[in-house]
């Protein structure tokens, strides 16, 4: 293995000569097919643990490296954590955490090249033999891009962190505080990895007196628009909610369709009202989130019948920078009412036109928009039925947990469907709730000493590196993708988090997040990761110069400046 060394570049900067070693680590990791929720997650943790255990430092200090199982997980998965204690004179307990996930999304999109998806060199050769979009062709032939699942998202980021762990294990005398390496599983689905790792970080804080000063996440960055040449670093991260709508109508035989109300009509109007709606973009610190978009829209009929559906179910991705879960519920109740009114207006207009053509006399339409949050519905049912309702629903939830085919989203829908049966008033309605965990927003503004020090360290690092790199390195406030950054710091207050829990039917059974553990860690975090394009797509690729050389050096400088003084 290549010995970590320094490369002197123009100016007064000294940069780590790290490209070959980070490339070596990246290829090792990419070649392990570690798709989320598969055995591969376990395999990559074993390999990574074995690799780190071969470093001389960890042979001397084996207790500084752990392979830690995830908690309350139906799968046998592990995180890998390691730390180096600095021995530089004047060192303190200040500790920086390097974070990266080792799982990937699936490889079905690689179609005929699926067997090469995790073999970067072979994949590149195969891609060059087929028609490619112009930009992809240019990158494939340049020699400066690595293709393959996980090359960008985010095994090259983990490789960068691994390089720094190895470097400081060889040079602890250059480290003024402590360095923690965390490679977690399950980032691409439910964040069980990072949520489990909170316990290990807490334990090390107690045992080794670590004072967690900052965290650097190494997830990928990408162009924000066509022709964008910037390489971005992000302070904090976007938050993500999954607002969901259980919609009931009035069932009828399709031969008497105007005697009922199809919930799919309301669902369609709801999607028309919410999908891509710029009014639902959240602006903060001069940045704007992407608008919501639907991730599922269906009725809940299990089989074909000629009766209209009893209920429909839709949910939407929803990003936030400053809005709380309570804010989003209020906002979407208004949107749901607009959609309901639009659906009834369209229904009336078409009903009257039909009656004119058929020679029928239209009846008066009695339905009115009716919107309830899950918490409001539960409050009504607890008041009406008390313990009877509570005991029945707890038993129902327990029985649902036995069905492994239900993810948290469909589990939540079934709970709402069951609760709906208890309501005396069965007139058409929309029940609004959350059906997945809330990934909290993180806002890093310099509001305390730790945030201010991290921001100053980042600014200084970019200023020093920029003369050695031709592309602009730009710092922005919010990482625009979902990441595990959401679970190392927290910007929401307890009331906001309570709104997310109280309106989540799966909370406490299928889903639980210990936000108190996140708040206990509450370390300011930035994202400084590899650059590339087409993450989660078959042309996923990582630009090597920035990712393998600039990123490790930037992270090293941030680490150094956070810990010094």
Where are these regions (language model features)?
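Short glycine/serine- and small hydrophobic-enriched flexible loop segments
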Residues: 162-170, 269-276, 556-560
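A glycine-centered beta->alpha junction motif in the catalytic cores
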Residues: 104, 245-252, 529-537
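Acidic/His- and Gly-rich active-site-bordering loop/insert found
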Residues: 6-147, 170-177
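An extended, acidic, His-containing surface patch that forms the Zn2+-binding/catalytic region
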Residues: 44-45, 61, 352-565
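Acidic/histidine-rich catalytic neighborhood of metal-dependent amide-processing enzymes
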Residues: 145-236
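Midchain, well-structured core segments that form catalytic/ion-binding scaffolds
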Residues: 203-409, 413-414
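Short glycine/proline-enriched loop/turn "hinge" motifs that connect secondary-structure elements
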Residues: 172-174, 234-240, 304-310, 422-425, ...
